[in-house]
């Protein structure tokens, strides 16, 4: 009688195990990712149009940064993050603004957007770090150059420097912020640069771009996270630098077999390069002999998809998912931009999809959505939020990604900067005497 009871119980247990859904036996690990371009605070395009009048360009940008007060924007961004609770956040345009009193003084950090955002989050998030490396890759920068980038801000500079003016510059970078609870789950971290760069002023001012990455254990499964910001400036009848940089990114990631998530502002819409007669208020790349309309080799987004990366969505071809279009002062889209956006099917004024989360190697998207597309705006981009499930739970740890470093400033670049500064100084002296 007892033997029969034991046998029945054993058969029942085996049957239960066989017919219980796998998901009920061991749930697959899940995590949430956010992509957010937090905006350096000024319209670089307008500033570039003011060059070679460097002081005017610098003052223009500084004034806009003050108007777009990040101490207020960081609170709004932090509230958004607290609402959605992403495990990992890919930040672009994580900006530091530096100023210096004179040519011989050290530069002083005046604004640090990443630190301000983390402070607004109350310590719940940190930058991924391991073995002395932090997931922050400095990219495009303009150093504070006396005479060239002098700006006037008496209220601020009197407290810091005891004078009304200072030479100011900035550095924008990519960063990976993670929940503090994941800080001890970081396996390794790296930062690297793209070989393709863009020179605004030949030999003097070069825009470097790159990416930062971290391998993090998500419920004991190692996942590789990458965040990047590809180049926005492009030249007619040339392959855009964004496409060249995407090609290198794909090459760098080709040996990664572990679950992979790539986050960022790719400065590439699926419609690029566009026919000359197509609506293009965002001034995205247009078709040419070198880059015919829709040519994959000239489109970072298409290159990623062709390389086997999955777009987490929402559907990038749907106008309601566009992420770029607010004006420089974050009051909304300009009237012409709004009209064009509404004609495309986006009621809020966004005209281009530039921000994405891509996955590969057994990372499956569960849900995705566009965030931050309604006023008030904390940045000039809408963001992307997605929840994922890890299907590839058996992959081994992949080797670290290759390291590429930017070329250091050369002797002739320093000579050029010195000569340009001298010329502007002499012009200013003559104007003062006149």
Indicate where each model-derived feature is located.
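Bacterial N-terminal signal peptides
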Residues: 8-21
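N-terminal, active-site-proximal structural segment of metallo-dependent hydrolase catalytic domains
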Residues: 25-157, 391-399
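Active-site beta-strand/loop signature of hydrolases that rely on acidic residues for catalysis
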Residues: 33-38, 73, 77-103, 214-216, ...
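Surface-exposed cleft-lining segments at the edges of enzyme active sites
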Residues: 60-67, 192-203, 229-242
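A well-ordered secondary-structure block
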Residues: 135-223, 227, 365
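Metal-dependent phosphoester-hydrolase catalytic domains
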Residues: 187-188, 237, 251-261, 268-394
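Juxtamembrane/start-of-transmembrane alpha-helix segments at the extracytoplasmic/lumenal side
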Residues: 400-416
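C-terminal membrane-anchoring or membrane-association module
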Residues: 420-434
